Amino acid sequence: MTAQYYQLDEKFNQQTYEQYGKGLALNDLYIRRGASGSLVFNQDQQISGIFFAVASHSDPKPGEKTLVQLLRLPVDESTTATVKDNCVPYDLIFGNRNTTHYYTQFAKQHHTHLYEQIQQSNDQLIKFIDRKNVSCSMVS
C-alpha cells in the first residue's frame, strides 16, 4: 500500500465539489463502497483519518485509490523534508494558529457534547482549545 497527498475537485450532477483540508489517496486498499466513515489508524494504532470515498464509480480494482480525510497532519522534526516543504500543521478538529474556523470553536460556542468532553478531559492534547493562544503542537 502506498500513500500520496492529493487535492480533490470532483464533478457530481453538474456541480463541482472541492475537498478542503488534508487527505490521503491510498492505493490497493480495496475498501468497498459503503465503508464511508470507517476509521483509519496509523502505525501506533491512533486514529489518523476517516475513509470517505473510492476514487472510481465501482468497487476498487488494483491500483485505484481510496480517499481518507486526515484529522491531523503534524509537521515537526520527524516529518520528511518533502512533506515539510508542502504542508503546514493541520488539525481538522482543533485548528492551528492560522485557522479562523474549526470544529471545536463551533462546539464551544454551541456548548455541544464534544465541548463538555473537552472541558472534563485531563488530556492536554485536547485541552489546548481553552487557551487564548492556540498553538501548533500536535501528535501524529
Curated annotation (Swiss-Prot):
InterPro entries: Flavi_NS3_S7, Uncharacterised_MG067. This is Uncharacterized protein MPN_580. Belongs to the MG067/MG068/MG395 family. It comes from the Bacteria. One of its GO terms (molecular function) is RNA helicase activity. It holds the Pfam family Peptidase_S7.
